[in-house]
Swiss-Prot record:
GO process terms (BP): aerobic respiration
Residue span of region NADH-quinone oxidoreductase subunit H: 1-405
Protein name per the record: NADH-quinone oxidoreductase subunits H/I
Keyword Zinc: no
Compartments, record wording: Cell membrane
Superkingdom as given in the UniProt entry: Bacteria
Subunit description: NDH-1 is composed of 13 different subunits. Subunits NuoA, H/I, J, K, L, M, N constitute the membrane sector of the complex.
Membrane topology: Multi-pass membrane protein
Reactions it catalyzes: a quinone + NADH + 5 H(+)(in) = a quinol + NAD(+) + 4 H(+)(out)
Residues the entry annotates as binding [4Fe-4S] cluster 2: 475, 510, 513, 516
Cofactor needs: [4Fe-4S] cluster
Transmembrane regions: 12-32, 82-102, 124-144, 170-190, 195-215, 260-280, 286-306, 318-338, 351-371
Swiss-Prot/TrEMBL keywords: 4Fe-4S, Cell membrane, Iron, Iron-sulfur, Membrane, Metal-binding, NAD, Quinone, Repeat, Translocase, Transmembrane, Transmembrane helix, Ubiquinone
């Protein structure tokens, strides 16, 4: 078990190697967390998530980082530029520094040197983490103030109040831990959790810490400093490109930091969980790093689960939770832990068991307060019945209000509804996604699906369109343009006197309503099942006549053909011409002209 005497004796090259290893370990947290969050939330919503960049979308985070780096870096004219540029740095550096005293594993051997999988440790390691993580809020406050805009300033002020409120509760959780462990060194706290983890001995502290760490990292449902619906983007509204990326990096690294700290303080750090701890050497050497990482990512999953399940709290609810519940309970619990420690020092072995029992009771009391605070208010009194069958409002009769309109059936407690939400999202993760893997797998459309338009032909190849422009007049989006022209004996395109010389449909405007189909008197215009209309430029989304005409079927004659011998215009409209080309003409192969590009 590493202790403080093990630190300070590593060769310089080993200290550098451990620093590089820790930096890479931290950098991997946001890269993996962003992808995992998008994948997990997608599964909760019965989607697939990122699946384009790399195998199964595994390189999506790298692609997003490159894209972010090449975005235009805008600096508004009204900002306080030095502080504006400094704020992202102040936010991200403390997130990395906090990991310096967190033990990732036990003692390992590297090139013949025995060292701890921890960069360093100190007698006040927990206080160091608390102080360093508190510095990060200055970056948020400075970003809001230096942006010179109202929304970022409000986001910065919210963040200040949020961190102050929940930092107190978190510090009291730390106090309970090092009172029980008898040390503030992180390696010593991990050693004090053999064989019983503090999550069982200090259950109220663990519960309060889990709530506080979500508020400390500004994550949903406590993401009030960057509430999109109220503050646009909060404190980083005016940031873009790499400066915005630094704030995102700080957020995800902070998630990893508080998760690693929860693992260290309450879940035994790098020690193996039951029943693996029964295996000799299960947490020796590099195995400890595996257990530590697994516990950290369990907390990271809970962060994502919270985001995918719970809505954002109101600001007054959030502050009331911190000041009226978490802080008073934390103060009471710290006094109880201190009393139990004093009793143990006097030789009363039963104090530990009593502490566990009181902790469970206090946790149940907290849950009860949650239920009471979240219970729906009682239904208002039933309204007095109207004197007549109708009420009159502004001279207009309105129906009477039913007597049970305000009745609430089966009101649920404050925690039961969120728990039901967690059950729903957990069950949805294992359902088959509804995402269609287009274009690799194209699902056939319904038979009556209306997609791209088509100009139809008569059985001998003549066009049905007569250039009447009724379709253009019927289009509510003004997406169709038609120019008619006269047929001649030498150049005939339709059986009648007129044909559509120019026919255009602008698919940037078309809404697919089908009114043009209903307006066509000759059934010349129909809609096909083709839904692939996307293009990379505007010009190609304006379909001309040659792209709208139906392809020539076998037996049809390439335009301009003559009318079938012995037929009149009426024969075409009555359906007397059923197929075959005129004897004087040579049939064209199918698809010779017209159809989709």
């Amino acid at each position: 078990m590493p202790d403080l005497s093990l630190f300070g004796h590593d060769p310089f090259w080993l200290v550098v190697a451990k620093s590089v290893f820790l930096f890479v370990y931290i950098i991997l947290i946001p890269l993996v967390a962003v992808l995992a969050e998008r994948k997990v939330v997608a599964r909760m919503q019965m989607r697939v998530g990122p699946n384009r960049v790399g195998p199964f979308g595994s390189l999506q985070s790298i692609a997003d980082g490159v894209k972010m780096a090449f975005k235009e870096d805008l600096v508004p004219a009204i900002v306080d530029k030095p502080i504006y540029l400094l704020a992202p740095v102040v936010s991200v550096i403390p997130a990395f520094m906090a990991f310096a005293v967190i033990p990732l594993g036990g003692e390992v051997s590297v090139a013949g040197n025995t060292t701890a999988l921890q960069l360093t440790d100190m007698p006040v390691g927990v206080l160091y983490i608390l102080a360093i993580t508190s510095i990060g809020v200055y970056g948020i406050v400075l970003a809001g103030w230096a942006s010179g805009s109202t929304y970022p300033l409000l986001g910065g002020l919210r963040s200040t109040a949020q961190v102050i409120s929940y930092e107190i509760a978190m510090a009291l959780c730390f106090a309970a831990v090092f009172l029980h462990a008898g040390t503030m060194a992180t390696s010593g706290i991990v050693g004090a959790q053999h064989p019983t983890w503090f999550v069982f001995l200090l259950l109220p502290s663990f519960l309060i810490y889990c709530v506080s760490m979500v508020g400390e990292t500004n994550r949903a449902p406590f993401d009030l400093p960057e509430a999109e619906g109220e503050l646009v983007g909060g404190f980083h509204t005016e940031y873009s490109s790499l400066k915005f990326a630094m704030f995102m990096l700080a957020e995800y690294v902070n998630m990893g930091t508080v998760s690693a700290l929860a693992t260290t303080l309450f879940l035994g750090g790098w020690s193996a969980p039951w029943p693996f701890n029964l295996i000799p050497g299960a947490d020796a050497g590099w195995w400890g790093l595996l257990w530590f990482t697994a516990k950290v990512w369990t907390f990271m999953f809970v962060f994502v689960w919270l985001r995918g399940t719970l809505p954002r709290l109101r600001y007054d609810q959030f502050m009331r939770l911190g000041w009226q519940l978490l802080i008073p309970v934390s103060l009471l619990w710290v006094m109880l832990v201190a009393t139990a420690r004093l009793l143990r020092a006097d030789g009363h072995a039963w104090a530990t068991g009593a502490q566990v029992v009181v902790g469970v009771a206090l946790t149940a009391a907290m849950i009860g307060l949650f239920l009471r605070a979240g219970r729906r208010p009682a239904a208002p009194p039933e309204p007095e019945p109207e004197p007549s069958g109708e009420a009159v409002f502004l001279g207009f009769p309105t129906p009477p209000v039913p007597a049970d309109a305000h009745r609430v059936d089966n009101p649920k407690g404050g925690l039961l509804e969120p728990l039901a939400g967690f059950a729903v999202t957990a069950a949805t993760m294992f359902k088959k996604p509804n995402t269609e893997f287009y274009p690799e797998q194209k699902v056939p459309t319904a038979p009556r699906y209306h997609g791209r338009h088509q100009l139809n032909r008569h059985p001998d190849g003549l066009e049905k369109c007569i250039g009447c422009e009724l379709c253009a007049w019927a289009c509510p989006a003004d997406a169709i343009y038609v120019e008619g022209a006269d047929n001649t004996e030498d150049e005939r395109y339709s059986p009648g006197e007129r044909y559509g010389r120019v026919y255009q449909i602008n698919y940037l405007r078309c809404i697919g309503c089908g009114l043009c189909i209903e307006a066509c008197p000759t059934r010349a215009l129909t809609m096909t099942n083709d839904y692939e209309l996307t293009d990379d430029n505007r010009a190609d989304l304006i379909y001309e006549k040659d792209r709208l005409l139906a392809p020539l079927a076998p037996g049809m004659v390439a335009p301009p053909p003559a009318m079938a011998p012995g037929t009149t215009e009426a024969d075409y409209y009555l359906g007397a011409v059923t197929g075959g080309a005129p004897a004087a003409e040579q049939p064209a192969p199918a698809g010779a002209k017209g159809g989709a590009r």
